[in-house]
């Protein structure tokens, strides 16, 4: 059942991305009518370049924004040995290990592929979790590495950036351009205006949906690695019970953390990069019945 859950999650992500890419293509062709194809292609290249920068430098940016410090085995043998054992178990290269000096319990993984992976845990996380729970959390993070989630999120980020840029340019063209002279009907004008306003919101919602699916997948991958889903479920319950905002908050890297680091509230719930903790725990308990 656990393998089928992992496969189903990957299929869900693929379907979301497939439909999103088709929608982006349709919106792009529609926008090209108003912007001109040469300008449209320029925007696509600009968005792709922006995504590439994010892809290659995402690890360094995450470390800088979080204030994480790189450690060796002697600095924190407990965390280091946990990650090392998981690296051996999964067959992945040993990632760089970091600690974020922050009382808020949390952890994240970043890096464009397993060879450039970085994993980090906050000091608050290390204080409240026992060894099996810590292993469960770090197995979740190694799951992100194994599933190439940074690559997936970069693809989505590039598409969202392209949609945002195209939408902005189309709106400017509609407001300031003389589209009637180009033979565009009033109906076409309204349709393009509608999609230009709606597209960025829809793109953001797709990005959030993909992020939530990858969290479920990392949970399942981590549980399969340790063969002890209850440990991760217990850790998530502790993280929820001891949740507090990080001292160095950044909404741009909120999706990287195992627990949503943003302050609680209506908008956090509405635009969350993470699925509900209760549902994650329920699924992990269901997986636990398989062992």
UniProtKB/Swiss-Prot annotation:
The active site is at residue 141. The keyword Zinc applies. The keyword Metal-binding applies. Its EC number is 3.4.24.-. The chain crosses the membrane at residues 11-31, 34-54, 155-175, 186-206. GO terms for cellular component: plasma membrane. InterPro entries: HtpX_protease, Pept_M48_protease_HtpX, Peptidase_M48. Disulfide bonds: none annotated. GO terms for biological process: proteolysis. It is found in: Cell membrane. Zn(2+) binds at residues 140, 144, 215. It is a multi-pass membrane protein. It holds the Pfam family Peptidase_M48. Binds 1 zinc ion per subunit. Keywords: Cell membrane, Hydrolase, Membrane, Metal-binding, Metalloprotease, Protease, Transmembrane, Transmembrane helix, Zinc. It is an enzyme of class 3 (hydrolase). Belongs to the peptidase M48B family. HAMAP family: Pept_M48_protease_HtpX. PANTHER family: PROTEASE HTPX. This is Protease HtpX homolog. It comes from Tropheryma whipplei (strain Twist). The lineage of its organism: Bacteria, Bacillati, Actinomycetota, Actinomycetes, Micrococcales. The gene is htpX.
